Amino acid sequence: MFKSVKSEWELAMFNSIWVSVWEEKGYELEYTNQVVERFLAVSDDGEYVGTSEIKPYLLGHNEIESVAPFRHHPKIIDDPARVAEIDKIAILQHFRGQQPISDLLSSAVYCAEKYNFRYFISLLEPVFYRALRITFHIPMEKVGGKQFYKGDDVIPVLFDMEHIYRNKKQYDWLTYQNSSDNRAMPAL
């Protein structure tokens, strides 16, 4: 399941999870003030086990531009207002597996559909990139080559979120089919 971060306590849990994972992996910490929405992956036992953060994309102003020239990509130039950045995809070590990833990916699709985003941009670890491509069949394209950034090698990618939310039946990992029928947890 997934849920949107709504309270200060949930924000504290969100920060605790991604900071713990970043420190485990040796990444530099970077906090974000401006977000569209933050999500928590929730285990079947009700534990918060993962995070994802959707940030607005401001053509040429996101730090991600220092790694790859997203602003020059034709799909982004076409309609930058329908682009967002997904960041802080993190799962606590002892919960890593397909379900939390499915839940976080589902939260991303849910958010993209809710806000009418067409594309998400991101920097992915090469192993995670491969898993998304092979296991989850995420429609995405590389926007640049692999390079070192803030503690690890990353691959800059563009996700076709609109393709996923317009073709939900093609993605068996998706944990919701429409905005009113999902594995999203209601606010407590």
Describe the residue ranges of each PLM region:
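Short amphipathic alpha-helix that is part of the acyltransferase structural core
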Residues: 1-51
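Short acidic (Asp/Glu) patches
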Residues: 24-25, 35, 64-74
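Short, well-ordered beta-strand micro-motif
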Residues: 40-42, 53, 156-160
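Conserved beta-strand in the GNAT
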Residues: 47-56, 60, 85
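Feature marks short, surface-exposed loop/turn motifs that line or immediately flank catalytic pockets
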Residues: 56-58, 128, 163-165
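A short, polar/proline- and glycine-enriched secondary-structure boundary/capping micro-motif
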Residues: 60-65, 97
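Acyl-donor binding region in acyl/amide transferases
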Residues: 69-154, 161
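Charge-rich, low-complexity intrinsically disordered segments
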Residues: 153-188
